[in-house]
């Protein structure tokens, strides 16, 4: 297999700042993760002299001196732009094969080079996610390269296929493949109060009631603004109850225990969210967190909502809509432009989001790997 990585892919350095910023900030809502990384880890003055598959940061390809492909490389890979994506993805979704325009040689070479780079990264990959138009063509080509590498010593092939003797099973180590995840946006002008300023349904006697506004435990500090409905911002005093709730959400959604994998780093992440007034919660009268939603990724006045979770004991009683609307109202006071993405098979969640004013503006895809 020719080494297309050396031929086409390079680490972005400070010379590419203007072009990278144009890519990221021209459409900030789907690019919030990459923007957050860019602002916290600016491009280096000079490109590092290490093999790219060991590099963590932005890499790209150029066409006629212009940046045409961008990929954020790390344990979590985010394809930000690919010069052939519009053609290939639109064709796959909307155009008959006989009428399909063909990708030019440069677009094909760039796609192959980026896929080959991920093949070299191998078992360090935890996930790949981003806009479907960029993720899915790259993921498809990556699987094809795994097939072509059959019998070789590709690290990613060994990750996806524990035993080469069993034949090529390029999904053997894929924990979850989620090709269709609607990207939703909540317009700032939406009236959320009508969803949360309501009487809650009656709950079974064995369930502790949600804590009503104004009945916070003595000494609890509300760092900013008023509660909305039954939701409020989490404080440092809530960490002990928030941690198991967040871990339960993560395990349900992703498929593994974040505390077991990330240890203290996961609790540190929650502390950061609390300190930044980015975690909205509902507790029961005993202080247990029964609902949560976070502004997981933020930039200026925009945030991506993550970690939406309702305790299993409280599901099926019509609480998700008023709790989530209240949490979104609180987060929107700090970040008027809220977005999130959700699995298309989660019909109940999709209905709840759309029923509280969220509108689809795009589509994400996520591939999660086992370690």
Segments (PLM) and residue ranges:
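Conserved donor-binding loop and adjoining core beta-sheet/short helix segment
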Residues: 2-11, 22, 28, 36-127, ...
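Recognition helices and adjacent regulatory flanks at domain boundaries
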Residues: 281-284, 296, 317-330, 341-343, ...
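Conserved acetyl-CoA-binding loop of GNAT-fold acetyltransferases
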Residues: 143-149, 166, 328, 354-363
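Conserved acetyl-CoA-binding loop-helix of GNAT-fold acetyltransferases
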Residues: 103-117, 307-310, 316-332, 350-355
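Acetyl-CoA-dependent GNAT
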Residues: 73-78, 254-255, 264-306
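Short amphipathic alpha-helix that is part of the acyltransferase structural core
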Residues: 1-36, 202-259
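Acyl-donor-binding surface of acyltransferase catalytic domains
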Residues: 74-226, 367
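Conserved beta-strand-loop-alpha-helix junction that forms the acyl-donor binding cleft
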Residues: 129-135, 312, 340-351, 366-371
């Amino acid at each position: 297999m020719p080494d297309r990585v050396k031929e086409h892919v390079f680490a972005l350095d400070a010379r590419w700042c203007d072009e990278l910023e144009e890519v990221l900030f021209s459409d900030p809502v789907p690019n919030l993760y990459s923007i957050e990384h860019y602002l916290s880890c600016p491009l280096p003055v000079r490109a590092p002299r290490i093999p790219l598959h060991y590099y963590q940061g932005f890499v790209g390809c150029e066409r006629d001196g212009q940046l045409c492909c961008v990929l954020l490389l790390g344990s979590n890979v985010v394809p930000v732009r690919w010069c052939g994506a519009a053609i290939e993805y639109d064709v796959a979704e909307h155009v008959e094969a006989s009428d399909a325009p063909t990708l030019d040689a440069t677009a094909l070479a760039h796609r192959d080079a980026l896929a080959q780079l991920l093949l070299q990264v191998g078992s360090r990959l935890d996930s790949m996610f981003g806009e479907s138009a960029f993720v899915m063509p790259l993921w498809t080509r990556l699987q094809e390269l795994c097939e072509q590498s059959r019998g070789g010593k590709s690290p990613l092939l060994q990750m996806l296929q524990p035993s080469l003797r069993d034949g090529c099973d390029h999904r053997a180590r894929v924990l979850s493949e989620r090709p269709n995840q609607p990207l939703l946006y909540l317009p700032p002008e939406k009236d959320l109060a009508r969803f949360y300023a309501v009487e809650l349904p009656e709950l079974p006697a064995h369930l502790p009631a949600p804590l009503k506004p104004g009945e916070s435990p003595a000494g609890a500090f509300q760092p900013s603004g008023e509660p909305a409905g039954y939701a409020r911002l989490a404080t440092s005093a809530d960490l002990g109850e928030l941690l198991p709730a967040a871990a339960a959400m993560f395990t349900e959604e992703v498929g593994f225990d974040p505390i077991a994998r990330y240890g203290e780093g996961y609790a540190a992440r929650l502390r950061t969210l609390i300190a930044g007034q980015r975690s909205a919660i509902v507790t029961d009268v005993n202080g247990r967190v029964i609902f949560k939603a976070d502004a997981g990724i933020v930039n200026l006045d925009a945030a991506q909502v993550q970690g939406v979770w309702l305790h299993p004991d409280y599901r099926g009683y019509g609480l998700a809509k008023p709790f989530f609307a209240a949490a979104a109202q609180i987060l929107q006071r700090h970040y008027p432009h809220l977005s999130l993405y959700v699995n298309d098979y989660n019909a109940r969640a999709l209905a709840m989001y759309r029923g509280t004013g969220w509108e689809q503006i795009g589509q994400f895809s996520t591939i999660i790997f086992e370690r």
